[in-house]
């Protein structure tokens, strides 16, 4: 049994041209697998970055809402000035 590109040739009687085509196809599939692995890594990396961005955005929004509520609370609890009192009388 001959060793063809790391695989034991169990297919006796297959023409050499066909075996060469099979080896080329196997190499092409290996390259495709490597490319898909690289794409998967990039996808995972982008996904992680997007999750971080989303979390950061949510935190910033919560901080802005808390700040806005704090300002509204301060405005509602401030004593009214004379002009406010005069406007209320009119």
From Swiss-Prot:
Instruction: Provide ranges: composition bias, Basic and acidic residues.
Output: 81-90
Which parts form a coiled-coil structure per UniProt? 16-78
Q: This protein's superkingdom?
A: Eukaryota
Q: Does the keyword Zinc-finger apply?
A: no
Q: What are the record keywords, sorted? A: Coiled coil
Q: Per its UniProt record, what InterPro entries does this chain match? A: BBLN_eukaryota
Keyword Coiled coil belongs to the record: yes
Which parts of the sequence are annotated with region: Disordered?
57-90
Task: Tell me its family.
Answer: Belongs to the UPF0184 (EST00098) family.
Quote the protein name from its UniProt record.
Answer: UPF0184 protein
What is the organism of origin for this protein? Answer: Branchiostoma floridae (Florida lancelet)
Its ancestry begins with: Eukaryota, Metazoa, Chordata, Cephalochordata, Leptocardii
